């Protein structure tokens, strides 16, 4: 008769963390890209010469998906229960890593989308606002970077649950 230790479900939590990192980060990137893109399109009607300058929020939003991809790859390469023991601690560490990066990317994408939309529209009417918009976008992008850094730290904690 076998006993259930819970470690059989640990890879589920690890893979859930990888999925959460990618899905939530890409949701933030998609929202930021769509919202900023609408602003660029409507601004391009009034001032077509500013379209390339106003593409910055769209690019910054797109980078958020890459952060989620990085964490998802780090997590998925750390899950190999056949090669070494993978405990619940490891699964929870990977889950929290994915959630930290993914939800930070989602919130950063929402901020970038809203600021980018309003910023490029305002930039069409008052070009002096461009620098302020870029600074706000940088602070919004920093939110996702915080999630990426915490995600890397948390995923590196996996495997430290027991001395082997």
Swiss-Prot record:
Tissue specificity is: Expressed in leaf, root, flower and silique.
Q: Where in the cell is it found?
A: Vacuole membrane
Q: Which Gene3D superfamilies match?
A: lithium bound rotor ring of v- atpase (1.20.120.610)
Q: Where is this site: Essential for proton translocation?
A: 141
**Which domain of life does the UniProt lineage start with?**
Eukaryota
| Any one GO CC term of the record | plant-type vacuole
Primary localization class, coarse: membrane
Keywords, in A-Z order = Hydrogen ion transport, Ion transport, Membrane, Transmembrane, Transmembrane helix, Transport, Vacuole
**Listed GO MF terms:** proton-transporting ATPase activity, rotational mechanism
Give the protein family: Belongs to the V-ATPase proteolipid subunit family.
What is the protein name given in its UniProt record?
V-type proton ATPase subunit c3
Instruction: Give the organism, scientific name.
Output: Arabidopsis thaliana
Q: Which gene encodes it?
A: VHA-c3
